[in-house]
């Protein structure tokens, strides 16, 4: 499409030379450069200079010499009519052949097919090289190529195919090559049957018919034109986008033939016939259906099927429409020009576009004008457009808002160094707040978020919204839609649908100008803006301002605002799509407005008058008011207020009594003279013909002192240093819990805490609170009065019972800079951060936590819950009961088809299937093969059962981008069943950041929180971290729809019947925890998900304990272990619920629950089958069941005897059936050592083999359990097994079993080898994922009922697998270089943590940095420091930058700063990081990024590593002691934790002080 601007015909925009040069600057690896006159596209032999500019390090342009200084080259890509015969001369002109060829017809048009066509092109190059080397003697290039062709059949074939080119370039070729045939041969005669040899990789062969279309030069009218089609029928049919062009062929070309070639290039064709065309292809040809050669009119119908669609949601893409309709056709050699004058979208296709989400009606509402006929929004552009600094910019806003409504950034205003966004936006906010308070009216601001990088746009937008706070709706987002492209508009539309999207079209005139006969008109441009979602667009002033335009441009306004509107060629029905509001600017002032409104017919537009406001003689306030009066004067004249007078006279009459409009006459006298003849006499003006404009006295701005703030005097601190007993400061036992809750300003946390021997309880508790908030182990000189106001306070202790309660001010916790939301990682960093490794604390564990309502509202909470599942299942929204689900077993090892078959089998009787937590994108079961099988199974099961089905897909990954890619792929595959899909996130191993990724990016999906691995912290054995109760409670706060809660002692995992309180806390609106009552204030529930050894027999007692059955069951063995298969297993579980309900209702009289269930089973075969399958459970729970059910068989039956042959009934959806062998593994209780242990394996061989990750554990079985049997069960749960044999295991599955290869029961040592194929891989790039390694190695095995404890003490990664991880991108060497110490042995980097860790405000923080940097090298944020309200990042980081700059200048040495970017939301992390780098400017490399890797999870570390590889990645491990402490026999050691940090890419990690400091450790 570039030809619309770069064509020599077009005297606007830039040339093709400039366009391609810019591509190298912004990072293109290659760009299409045309063929320099040697192909079919426009061009000239001198265009070789384009190639030199792209590839050389120094190159001359038409005017300038450019030195590229080692910047990599951009490779020319040549295409457009090129074939083997044209190449030699092209290379000779260019001087080399180091280019990329993309020959369409040159390959697929070759008479012998694409293989020979490709070879012929390579031979074209070879022939030129040999001629150049003198191989053929002193002959012409033409003769040399012919000589080569004599012995090379493919090049010879090119002569026979492209004979016109041969005749022109190689005269006499026929005689030289001995060719005596016809002058034309049938092209595209490639025998497609040959492709059958490749059946293995392309699937079954397709019979193809030979093309019957003769090669008729470029006349393709027989295929690409059908003048019998009528526009009426095409519109009625609704399957085509219609486009009307003004098109002129080059001299000598037939109009219809050229039009058909135009349509061909715009759809399925090219300049020759090609062998790949088949019958279907022709069904999507674009067709010329109307031509008028005399008036150069041409209309083309494009089938909507031609256009690309999103893979994520099926929406339409405007870039695809434009790529076809004004793409390659803009540079065709036979077309003089072609420009779109109108375009029609059929309703069905139009609905696939976004359309506007907001419009002027939303502005009127904010301005208090209602929603109908709100009239003119009086706005301005801050002038000068560049050069104002932040305070003057804010003052200018304040001045205008005294009388006006709306201010926009001028399109180039953004984040210039002299007016940075983080300094300017706060000034705008202050001005808006002050103006609204003073005028009592709403005000509006349009902030420019345009950027090259969508991430930057999003970061800007979020920063602005955060600054705007409660005034966020008053903020529009301006996007320079022409220069940044439609992608930028879509970024704004889809990420911020609540904001008015202000489309600025600066630069459009390069294409739309009437002078330009390419591209599209301004009418078309603005029409497209409505389609893609602009709320408002600049439309020009229809000849009433200074820009190009015409009074007839009012049709643009009608097309943008009406629901049915006529364009030059087509009537468009918008079907209720919201309007796009015209924005008028460019020389407009109060005097020009009345006639503009009269031409348009209304005033429902937005005005942005720069000079019209700031040029007014009395200042911007009066300028704004004068514009509003211009509208009012027109309305009164229109209503007949001034009688039968001209509009001109009516406006003058109004001005007599309105000083501001009168002032506009005195200011803009030339306009007045032209539009209002005789105005001076009528207004009694006798002065000079011109007055001094814009004489506004800026001193008046001082009246606005209230909004810019007064200076603050700071007092010196009088706090003496008092060793470690900080109880006088960090404890206040007079505080009552009742008052703290009533006050609503504190998060309350209840701990079980024990000091080390010899330490005072209160003193230790106070030190704990100090380390958790503003203090440390000594008093520091930087503490001031404010700091103490945010101290955490111990308000209750009970040393005897080891109870301690701390109140944390909510102001302590970090907030998003993007939207002000709260962050759970900040809560955890403080409440279980460094306090988990304190030298005076034996242990400290959270047993309850209370969130005050005002703070709780800042968290997401769930967006979906079980109610949404019930609705899909057809059960209404109240009391829908048990959702019967399963986990596909084996958890790993199934390939895609068996996986789909297993889903289908279960869905015959069940509701819900979840991926097991390690299932993802393993090489043996890749997501792009597995998910389609799941979709087929779901569709078939829904059709057969007539009931909705649900699937929970695992999207967990280290990288949030990978998570989002997975989720979007899955939704795309699910299509109309997307709502049936939940997203599973391994929230413990991947961290809360991963949960937030899912919650905020996919709020319509049920968010399934899997907690595998949590037992490493929550286990009752572990006296650090938090309890399972707290863990699940926090899941509701951060937005989980459902979370695994254990089975309350009724399954195989750890737990207790009293765990039902977890369920109450998750589902009730008011619930009591061990210490606090939590009021949820209507926050949606988080549904308990129960799994782990559950089956139909265990369910009734579970429901009776809980009191209801409104939970989700995921029974693996309970379904797939059922003797009759998963369908009957699922039904049996539903019957387990039903039997409990009937017993509860008294159906079976006054009998025990046990007897009631047995009674039900007598008449229900599936539940009866559960008794026969799970006999040990039956014996334990239902004594005497055999007699009651009349069972006289053996005491055990073969489990999993499901007959897989039944699956063949589903052949339609699973494809060909696969023969399956019956399992020969006998059920040996939990002894799986015959399968999951092989003690003959040697470590040496395993390492040599390189296919296993080896993990060394200290593991102790529960009393009475065999060591090897327990170890094998541990390996089974960590890979492909479960607690029973299941019917889905096949031969392949066993090849990826984890194997115990060494045990030493006496020393409790166990080693397991995990095949690397077990671990999940990214779908985006195939990289490995640490969360997958941890999910298996310390996942469910951390809560097994037969394991007392199991902890990783070492881990080995084989080289081939290790290479799939990131590893560090930077290290201390990079720091030494900045510090001027070289790259070897640079020694100690002397750093500090700014203390107090919390409580310093920005200026004291910067002063503290400056003081340290006088002698030191490196400063880090303490891990909780972020964006607290008292020390916001946008105020603090500039102080750090000033301090760093000053210190570097004074000391002459580099300085380093590590900024904390940790957040729950990866988008927030990226926004913080980009903001900081922007502030750092040329000192960006001096900045490291700190991530709280333990509390935020490895996902957060990966966000930093992959998005900012040039920054030192500083891994803070606060909180790790909850797992790594020697006291804790679960999880992993500190050694393993730090080792893993290197694998995932940390540049540095806190390692403790090896006993030489205050934290735990050893030499």
Swiss-Prot record:
The keyword Lyase applies. Coiled coil: none annotated. Its EC number is 4.1.1.39. The active site is at residues 383, 504, 889, 1010, 1395, 1516. It catalyses: 2 (2R)-3-phosphoglycerate + 2 H(+) = D-ribulose 1,5-bisphosphate + CO2 + H2O; D-ribulose 1,5-bisphosphate + O2 = 2-phosphoglycolate + (2R)-3-phosphoglycerate + 2 H(+). Its main location: plastid. The record marks 40, 546, 1052, 1558 as: Transition state stabilizer. GO terms for biological process: reductive pentose-phosphate cycle. RuBisCO catalyzes two reactions: the carboxylation of D-ribulose 1,5-bisphosphate, the primary event in carbon dioxide fixation, as well as the oxidative fragmentation of the pentose substrate. Both reactions occur simultaneously and in competition at the same active site. Belongs to the RuBisCO large chain family. Type II subfamily. This is Ribulose bisphosphate carboxylase. It comes from Prorocentrum minimum.
